[in-house]
Amino acid sequence: MNKILIVFCALCTFQFSIMAQSFRTTSAIYNVKNFGAKGNGTVMDTKSINKAITAAATEGGGTVYFPAGNYLSGSIRLKSNITLCLDAGATLIAAPGENADEYDVPENKIDNMYEDFGHRHWHNSLIWGENLHDISIIGSGMIWGKGLERSNKGEDDKRPNKSISLYLCRNVIIRDISMLHAGWFGILATGVDNLTIDNVKMDTNRDGMDIDCCQNVRVSNCSINSPNDDGICLKSSYGLGFARATENVTITNCQVSGFEEGSFLDGTYKRNDSRRPTGRIKMGTESNGGFKNIAISNCVFEYCSGLALETVDGAQLEDVTINNITMRDIVNAPIFLRLGARMRGPEGTPVGMLRRVIISNIVAYNVDGKAGAIISGIPGNDIEDISLHDINIYFKGGGTKEQASIEVPGLENGYPEPGRFGVTPAYGFFVRHVDGISFDNIHLGLMSNDDRPSFVLDSVKNASFRFVNTPVRQGLENLYLKNTENVKIFQSFGSEDTTVKKVSFVKM
């Protein structure tokens, strides 16, 4: 027995030795300071960093290592089989405007105008890569986009505006880093497949991460604070020059918020109640290619906008599950589903579809009282097959009887944003142009009096309410039905079970 154990241990030791030797051979370390980087925050280190990357790539790949220090840099050009490792205490700083020549200029990759400037250019970034494979950005250090712009004024504006920008890449890992003031986009991934973003902490003032036309994506354990734009945003633009779906995506164990920029990472969590922070998880607005097979779970929203699923440029948004979400201090609609016809894309593209979505196990507290949750298609194009169950939402209230008669604008061709619809006639859910929606085990609460109904259904077919609990308010109805067909009510609203076959208008 002892001889067998000795032989087994010897084999294990030999195998480990071979694996370790292989790791050393294929994962050499290239310290940027050995290539001339100073890391003192005053001398430009762009050339030294890119020299280290080129040296590693020439040898087949490796890890480009940043020890503790402040590295002032312009555009860093990634290559295949390269890992950038920012060690604890290392800060990579985007050089300010007077060092504009340190950045690569925006390339003219596509000539359509179906998307914003930022979605048509990738090279004008702090870190960028194109047509690469097997790349990583890891470590406990920080990327500070000090010199990055939060927007660009037009096609002739050459200023850098992104922290990390990847185009048509595969097998990508971004892990453990912190990011501050990350530009127009903290992470812009366009046409990137097999992408993992894990344990990233970002405190910025525009989009945190935009995942555009990507497939097989895992976002996990991330904290994104973005008061003036979206935190985690899935898109499917025309940025590749053709439509491509964003699909097979999981977003799990993440936190999004809208505190003042910089106050998330420093732990002060400052609020500015003079504006409505964004900072949410969203699909859209760019929606040419579609969104398919998406799972969002175990996420926290705090002091920000609510969940938004939007397709307005002809794409199909389908087969989506959203589960185990908590929200607190939400400044507009806690749930926003929008099928529209903005149609920023090739002429002749038909209106898209929004269907087969399940939203469950949601708790939202202190939700803005002006607009309830909004689920809205457009005439001739219904949202289909929506299931909402096990949801508790507590609204601030404050609505009036007069507001219960508000006609909500259609905005069929407009930009999809909850605030543009104004005050809704329901404090809870406003549902319009939907075929197939179920509400099961829903609890709505009011933090102050509200004289609007809990639900308004307009031009809706095949709706069901089961175990829906709303506040008892003397002399006020809970449900308005307008131009509605086949509505089933079971043990809900404290009323008798009933089925409404077809009605032009009724209050219940």
Residue ranges of predicted features:
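Sec-dependent N-terminal signal peptides
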Residues: 4-14
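Extracellular/periplasmic carbohydrate-active domains that bind, remodel
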Residues: 12, 17-508
